[in-house]
């Protein structure tokens, strides 16, 4: 079957992004067995990032948001993150080495992954779900030290998407949305490009 049963208790407009951003962030959190006791970092606090924070918190993890925009801190905490690290600061990663079990990178801009990898605990994984236009490079030593892994994830299948929708219904999780009229679409696009959403 290709139809989903939508939770009756959730707003329809706020559920729409769950079928993209929702499952894209839920799937790797489940695959890497995030739950109580997990120490998770979410890089980026946009459309994907805010969903990753909500899901990881609901799964029982301690969540830290990594963002170059300190204006995102209040939203990160409102969604349940316990910590916020401003990655716009030089040497931001110092003092956070070997802290996280999992980093979910939701950023679509090019990032130097080396500082992020240094914050992974032994056997930690950095999962890429943002799609930058430039390739990144990683030194072998950054992976060998601590047996770290670098992986990627893209969306999820139909059964997992239904599981995610059910989880959202049970935990009252929806995307943050702004509903607009059709005549505002060009302005909305411009705002999205300018990161004004």
Explain the meaning of each model-derived region.
Residues 114, 158-197:
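C-terminal hydrophobic helical "lid"/dimerization subdomain
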Residues 49-50:
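N-terminal Rossmann-fold NAD(P) dinucleotide-binding loop
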Residues 120-122:
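Helix-to-beta-strand junctions that scaffold the AdoMet/dcAdoMet cofactor pocket
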Residues 36-45, 57-115:
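Adenosine-nucleotide cofactor-binding segment
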Residues 29, 53, 73, 113-116, ...:
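Generic hydrophobic/aromatic pocket-lining and core-packing "Φ" positions
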Residues 39, 124-126, 149:
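Short glycine-centered segments of the SAM/dcSAM-binding site in methyltransferase folds
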Residues 1-43:
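NAD(P)H dinucleotide-binding glycine-rich loop of Rossmann-like/cofactor-binding domains
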Residues 130-147, 158-167:
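Rossmann-fold NAD(P)-binding glycine/threonine-rich loop
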């Amino acid at each position: 079957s290709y139809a989903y049963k939508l939770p009756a208790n959730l707003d329809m407009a706020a559920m729409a992004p769950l079928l993209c951003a929702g499952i894209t962030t839920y799937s790797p959190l489940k695959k890497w067995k995030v739950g109580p006791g997990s120490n998770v970092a979410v890089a980026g606090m946009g459309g994907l990032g805010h969903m990753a924070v909500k899901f990881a918190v609901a799964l029982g993890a301690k969540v830290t948001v990594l963002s170059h925009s300190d204006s995102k801190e209040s939203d990160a905490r409102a969604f349940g993150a316990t910590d916020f690290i401003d990655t716009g600061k030089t040497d931001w990663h110092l003092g956070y080495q070997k802290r996280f079990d999992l980093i979910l990178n939701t950023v679509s801009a090019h990032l130097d992954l080396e500082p992020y990898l240094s914050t992974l605990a032994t056997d930690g994984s950095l999962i890429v779900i943002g799609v930058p236009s430039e390739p990144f490079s990683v030194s072998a030593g950054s992976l060998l030290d601590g047996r770290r892994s670098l992986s990627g994830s893209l969306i999820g299948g139909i059964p997992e998407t239904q599981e995610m929708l059910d989880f959202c219904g049970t935990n009252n999780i929806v995307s943050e949305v702004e509903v607009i009229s059709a005549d505002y679409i060009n302005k909305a696009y411009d705002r999205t490009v300018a990161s004004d959403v």
